[in-house]
């Protein structure tokens, strides 16, 4: 059994994929988090809960959880997440892309901090999803953000 946490879970795409790929119960989602900052309505989280239940699901700012209630994040073997892409997306020009320093780009550090704080119990596996412009955005740092993530 591969104990898995799902960050930036949205409506549960990673979970559906993992469960569909391994119908033998190989993956167990032990904790999930979905939070849309600045929004009173948490539609994605509501859909996640409707589909999978609210047990072990967190609908709050992941940065707050990591900084103030870290011990509530269970030990896990696999961390999956599609961290927000707005600061890398083609919806912005390369000059306006903020990258890892942007409002949403900084959420990468929540992933990093979970791994760092778990130390000897850090997950063995990490599976992340983002847009291809992560490799070349922002213009002022061409590829440095991705290099920082890999080095972390």
Indicate residue ranges for each PLM-predicted region.
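Conserved active-site and SAM-binding loop architecture
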Residues: 1-152
